[in-house]
């Protein structure tokens, strides 16, 4: 103790040391690395790279450990290194906490705090490496050495030989992503650096010995120098050395020499901030009672800090700072609880019924009451430590049980508790229960559970001695499995039980795991070939799937796992090994928005479906065992079986990003489980009676009587054939397995298929009838239809490059009538799915249809009308085609959905937040996701539309009109983007998703533009013209009109009017861009067919008329890229998307006068409706489309535009007036 104190004092003289100490007291005060914040308690300024959140915890932890050492009989002054003292136990606890902290850091700050995570791993690994390390720490010389280990010369007196040999193990710098604990890069460490040999009883070591370097003080960047990251070196912000006082003997002068590397630093990598460092008080006399200080709160959870404060009894500010450092980014790691020195508190076991921030019971009762009592009696700790010393590596199954990983087979006997669990629910309850938590705690203490440094990121427990296991992925999520909550202040949370996460999840999941959410976001699903079974099977290998949402329209899915750990493990696994369905690589990540899924209208009990799938899976396993015997276990990959090779139908690229590399064939990724899909036997078994699936007894029966499956499934085999044909027929989603995975379906898959077939057939008929009616309503429509077909044939790709694979064939398969039917069907479905906006949209759509019909009639009256009708026919047909395509895949997805849910997607889409998520779908921040988002075009919800919007914006910048379209698309049209990819190729390939859609629409508009400008002006044209005139007079700043149009639930008539204004605009523009800008109006013009489509789409669209417009835009997109783009902009611009639709490129709203209040706010110039005046005038009027329209009108029809604006309310008269003007100007 004296030595430590003296050394700490020595260190104190050094300026940096003292500041570090202060930093420890005042997190972030001393930490030169700003990131340290509270964590940077002892970080010397020289290395300012501490990963802010993670490192704070470590330094404090280190300080706490130092204090404990000082106070402990075996502290610095007591050279009892071989004897596990309470201090060593506490150090072990600190180590565990550090590990936990690192895990959390890894989880939350893998990107920003990679260094910190690495440091934590290293530090924890080092600490865990050996009890001797703790003993060394306790030993005065040891303590001294540690202080300077970070390359800071340590007090020579203290540990002259403790300097870390240059060859000492160096942990990757905090900046590195937690590499394996020992990096063996110690060479960087100055000889003075104290190397803590994992197994050395005393700090001094031969330089040649690889030793754990305590240079944790290094913050952040610490070169991969040494063992503990010389954290002090790296960022030295973490070093507690400056706070030599706080680090009594820990890194007295050495620490100060290091400037940042202090013994405290040892624990806290610079990345972590110096807070983790042990304060001198903790170890030195100053630490009176500070040894009680909480080990090292991993997070600056704030609460933890407060808790830690109480823990520090006579703790000096440094110690307080350490508890404060708990505030690091991970509340889970609480400073206080880390080292419960006193017996004051028995382990407080996690009460599964008691809410915890981490969904996991405190690790092994790690939760301490406010962590004040968090430290367990030193005696108890010592015992624990001793137990820890005898480390027995856990078996894989033991680790899984320890971490609460859902068992693959049930019933399951918990190897930790010897309790038999019969189902996942019971397992979940058991894992969260006190018994399991206690057993895990005891087990961890006795067995010294240590995670193998299998993952650079995370196994913290490098040393058998230290049980402090690095919970690889468990931070918060895995903690729940362990039944320990990291977030609470369980000082012990970090404890041996810390290895809450299965090692498998240790690496990649960290970045994903920012929360304890159980929802996994799956993007890039094959458009037509992904079934619920496929999605659910992705998660089954990792545990129970409690809920899911399959959004076929967006090619996205959300899986809710029973445990956060399972979700994280799943994400991590698939990050390492991409999941592939039908050759499409899936983007799987933790949902950033949803912690759990709540279906507004679960069509069928998800539990039942999932149970069926589980049963099926088990059954498959049994069956395989029977058929293949022991050799069956092909791949250990948890996903091997879960990956559903069932997607047989060709994947539709609309959902998958064009960028996603082709995935292995289903057979490949199926891991030879082709038998599932291709094996009639397997399929029959799968599709066997759903009821048997649900019962495990049935599984047994199946095993006993495998032929029963065949007998049962013979009819289903036929169904299988039907299904196979069906996907080919345009219902790829309805693969033979769409339902096979869901034994729920009371009706056999075949019956379901038959129903679907009947339904679709009926739908097409109804749609055909409706379409015919529309054509009848507008004589020119037939011609338009023909043109649309031609255009379809010409622009199949523009229509939807992404969909082309599946949609093109669909279009080919289905006649225009069928397309119309599908449009109607989609409309119906959408209406069902999107009940909220369905009524409004229907009304709007109806109005639009009527208006469109009227306009068409008007057009028939005039050549322009005829031209417009032609265009409309084209648009309508393409729109129908596109709608049909969309419906095809939607119906497919719905067909799948129907298997599980009612036919209406309405039930399917229904995470209360899913709409939001899809709207923002920031979750998949990947271009693929953007592309995926567009798939949701029909669905009002495009979680990833935001991404699409962003991409779209960029692409739009490339082209003004495309830009505008993209803006609209970005918001509301993102959904269309995927569909329009085909069109996009024709228009512009710059934007794979949104741009594509917009571009195609623009191109089509351009193509039609001549006709439209010449003849295609309908009544709506007048409105559009007025708008344009207004826009011209004002400015052409109306990107938002599209959004407004979408947003506003204006009647379809108005929309119909809008299209003509767009047509006028197109004419006025006379350029493809103009056409594109006005494409949406034109599309609207083609109101009878288009509007019908729009109605369907509107019904489909959750949004109101905007959605219908959006649908309409889609149709138009099919008809013409430019045209579609405009229209897409309008409908795509959803109210929620409006702000996003607006591009800040154009900062000044111009032509605001063109925005007139109607049902919503309608831009006469651009023919767009907006629900929000602000959006219309501020956002839309800044849009490139609006600007262009304004320019053209200002230059060509400024005067006329004003007049027309006055008469904009009367669509036909205005259209009549506007059309000539447009024609003139365009001509």
Swiss-Prot record:
Where can this protein be found? Nucleus; Cytoplasm, Cytoplasmic ribonucleoprotein granule
Spell out the InterPro entries in the cross-references: Matrin/U1-C_Znf_C2H2, Matrin/U1-like-C_Znf_C2H2, Nucleotide-bd_a/b_plait_sf, RBD_domain_sf, RBM20_RRM, RRM_dom
Q: What is the effect of changing residue 685 to A?
A: In A10 mutant; does not affect nuclear localization
Q: What is the effect of changing residue 1057 to W?
A: In CMD1DD; uncertain significance
Swapping residue 914 to A leads to an effect described as: In CMD1DD; impaired mRNA splicing of target mRNAs; does not affect nuclear localization
Effect ascribed to mutating residue 1080 to D:
In D10 mutant; mimics phosphorylation; does not prevent nuclear localization but induces increased localization to cytoplasmic ribonucleoprotein granules
- Xref: Gene3D superfamilies: 3.30.70.330
Q: How is it modified after translation?
A: Phosphorylation regulates the subcellular localization. Phosphorylation of Ser-635 and Ser-637 in the RS (arginine/serine-rich) region promotes nuclear localization of the protein. In contrast, phosphorylation of the C-terminal disordered region promotes localization to cytoplasmic ribonucleoprotein granules.
Q: What is the effect of changing residue 637 to G?
A: In CMD1DD; also found in patients with left ventricular non-compaction
Q: What is this protein called?
A: RNA-binding protein 20
Q: Organism source for this protein?
A: Homo sapiens (Human)
What lineage is on file? Answer: Eukaryota, Metazoa, Chordata, Craniata, Vertebrata
